[in-house]
Amino acid sequence: TTTWRSLQSEGSYGMNLWLDNQGVYINDFPADHYYSQYSTAPAEVPAYGDSVWVGSWPDGGDTMPGDLKGDGYGNGSFPHSKGRFMGRFALERHGNGINVGFVDGHTERVSVQGLWMLNWHKENVPNPNIELR
């Protein structure tokens, strides 16, 4: 199995949904985490990145997924709950790195562990202690 699978509804890249303060799920997450518009987000906020889904609400407190290959579809390990959303970006692509595009337009290759150090939302607390499983 590969992280480049082809289910109809999955993504190859996913949006940082903390930048979508008009989305249908806005009431499911703390309002103070969202940016009101891209222009108010600092340059180091990720806008999108390699992902197994079209979007996510990553947080520095999320757990490291046990599956970095994207095999979680249909077996209960798909990262679709609070505390697990970073797993949509945490993949074995590009030598355990993820291509991330930031709100100012620049791109970077970020290590899987480095995802936990990014400022995904306004109240995010980076986690330098995350480890690969």
State the predicted function of each range:
Residues T1-R133:
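Short, well-structured segments within or immediately adjacent to enzyme catalytic domains
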